[in-house]
Design a protein with these regions (language model features):
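Alpha-helical transmembrane segments and their immediate juxtamembrane cytosolic regions
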Residues: 1-230
Length: 230
């Protein structure tokens, strides 16, 4: 099937990921017994990983792209800590750190593979190992497995039969990153990803930064509600 005939663009995927993430975090903070909300939320992370991989491939300014992720990762940390019931902790870091590490690994691997000299290819394995271990050490959301999931989407984006490879890779991710069987519902994220047409959809600076800001703003609001209202 021609990708251009598929119904979902990048904007649609972003909105779907945001809505499912919001439902997930509402379940985590306000309605801890509503397991269905956590199940719905399993779709969010794979879609975000896919979007980061697409962003890495199409951005015209890698430094600015990485800087945005870094700035919002730092800004999100206080709200993320509050969502976990503390004002400050270094025990667990928010998901934007995972996505940032994933993006950096993708670019290093891409650079290493396009290099003609052997020494240029060697950093690929090192970048993957460092990205994985750093995410594990920092205890970012989804850890090193999340970094590898971003890389999987990035490296297979032009591969024949990519949807099958991505589905299998996502299944391995679900098995490795969590003992909870509900994590397997993340496989459903491949349905909207399979319907992606490669187009950006409506975009603009305000909307772009609004998507980034949504993460710290919504978890801060939910955290305050959980602490002082519910």
């Amino acid at each position: 099937m021609n990708e251009k005939t598929l119904p979902l663009n990048s904007l649609h995927l972003k909105l779907l990921a945001m809505v499912t993430m919001l439902i997930d975090h509402m379940g985590a903070t306000l309605f801890p017994y509503a397991l269905w909300m956590r199940c719905v939320g399993r779709l969010a992370f794979p879609i975000f990983c896919f979007l980061i991989a697409e962003g890495c491939a199409h951005t015209r300014d890698k430094k600015r792209y990485a800087a945005r992720l870094l700035v919002f990762a730092v800004l999100s940390e206080p709200a993320f800590d509050l969502m976990h019931g503390v004002w400050f902790t270094m025990d667990h870091q928010n998901v934007l750190w995972t996505l940032l590490l994933g993006a950096l690994v993708c670019w290093v691997v891409d650079w290493a593979q396009t290099g003609a000299a052997l020494w240029q290819r060697l950093p690929a394995e090192a970048a993957i190992a460092v990205g994985f271990l750093l995410a594990q050490w920092l205890n970012t959301d989804y850890g090193g497995w999340g970094v590898l999931l971003v890389l999987l989407f990035y490296m297979t984006r032009r591969t024949k039969g990519k949807l099958v490879i991505q589905l299998l890779g996502l299944g391995v991710f679900c098995w490795l990153c969590s003992p909870w069987r509900g994590q397997l519902l993340a496989l459903l994220a491949m349905l909207p990803i399979a319907l992606y047409n490669g187009e950006r959809g409506f975009s603009g600076k305000a909307l772009q930064y609004g998507f980034y800001a949504f993460y710290p703003v919504h978890i801060l609001i939910l955290s305050v509600l959980a602490q002082y209202v519910f």
